[in-house]
């Protein structure tokens, strides 16, 4: 039986992080968590490309464009959508999630979904380094695991 596990990545990788500026109190913490996890995994600073976009709606397009450049091995998309008093929250959540899923499924490299969608700012902050952990950090760790699995899958040929 062959078993493929998310082992530590054995080749140099370059990672893109696309981060939304909107709700930057949260997204800067998500970004810091992702960068810290990548550095702890041995990814040098020069192999991390950070791209800032206005908000969650811009994440899918820029993530897809970045994934097509051929200069990175994987992308982490980070954002925070906090529910307000209108339906705008619902549409932003649906469209950013669908767009990032499409970029991941049809694009050339893996895309990690790190967009918080919360009922209030406290929930968002709890998931950006508070008692709920740091979802940016978790996305970085997940990306490295997926890259490892994909490397092992390519070696099956």
From Swiss-Prot:
<feature type="binding site">
    <location>
        <position position="127"/>
    </location>
    <ligand>
        <name>(2S)-2-hydroxy-3-oxobutyl phosphate</name>
    </ligand>
</feature>
<dbReference type="GO" id="GO:0005829">
    <property type="term" value="C:cytosol"/>
</dbReference>
<comment type="function">
    <text>Catalyzes the formation of 6,7-dimethyl-8-ribityllumazine by condensation of 5-amino-6-(D-ribitylamino)uracil with 3,4-dihydroxy-2-butanone 4-phosphate. This is the penultimate step in the biosynthesis of riboflavin.</text>
</comment>
<feature type="binding site">
    <location>
        <begin position="80"/>
        <end position="82"/>
    </location>
    <ligand>
        <name>5-amino-6-(D-ribitylamino)uracil</name>
    </ligand>
</feature>
<keyword id="KW-0808">Transferase</keyword>
<comment type="pathway">
    <text>Cofactor biosynthesis; riboflavin biosynthesis; riboflavin from 2-hydroxy-3-oxobutyl phosphate and 5-amino-6-(D-ribitylamino)uracil: step 1/2.</text>
</comment>
<dbReference type="GO" id="GO:0009231">
    <property type="term" value="P:riboflavin biosynthetic process"/>
</dbReference>
<comment type="similarity">
    <text>Belongs to the DMRL synthase family.</text>
</comment>
<feature type="binding site">
    <location>
        <begin position="85"/>
        <end position="86"/>
    </location>
    <ligand>
        <name>(2S)-2-hydroxy-3-oxobutyl phosphate</name>
    </ligand>
</feature>
<dbReference type="Pfam" id="PF00885">
    <property type="entry name" value="DMRL_synthase"/>
</dbReference>
<protein>
    <recommendedName>
        <fullName>6,7-dimethyl-8-ribityllumazine synthase</fullName>
        <ecNumber>2.5.1.78</ecNumber>
    </recommendedName>
</protein>
<dbReference type="InterPro" id="IPR034964">
    <property type="entry name" value="LS"/>
</dbReference>
<feature type="binding site">
    <location>
        <position position="22"/>
    </location>
    <ligand>
        <name>5-amino-6-(D-ribitylamino)uracil</name>
    </ligand>
</feature>
<dbReference type="GO" id="GO:0009349">
    <property type="term" value="C:riboflavin synthase complex"/>
</dbReference>
<dbReference type="GO" id="GO:0000906">
    <property type="term" value="F:6,7-dimethyl-8-ribityllumazine synthase activity"/>
</dbReference>
<dbReference type="InterPro" id="IPR002180">
    <property type="entry name" value="LS/RS"/>
</dbReference>
<feature type="binding site">
    <location>
        <position position="113"/>
    </location>
    <ligand>
        <name>5-amino-6-(D-ribitylamino)uracil</name>
    </ligand>
</feature>
<dbReference type="InterPro" id="IPR036467">
    <property type="entry name" value="LS/RS_sf"/>
</dbReference>
<feature type="binding site">
    <location>
        <begin position="56"/>
        <end position="58"/>
    </location>
    <ligand>
        <name>5-amino-6-(D-ribitylamino)uracil</name>
    </ligand>
</feature>
<feature type="active site" description="Proton donor">
    <location>
        <position position="88"/>
    </location>
</feature>
<keyword id="KW-0686">Riboflavin biosynthesis</keyword>
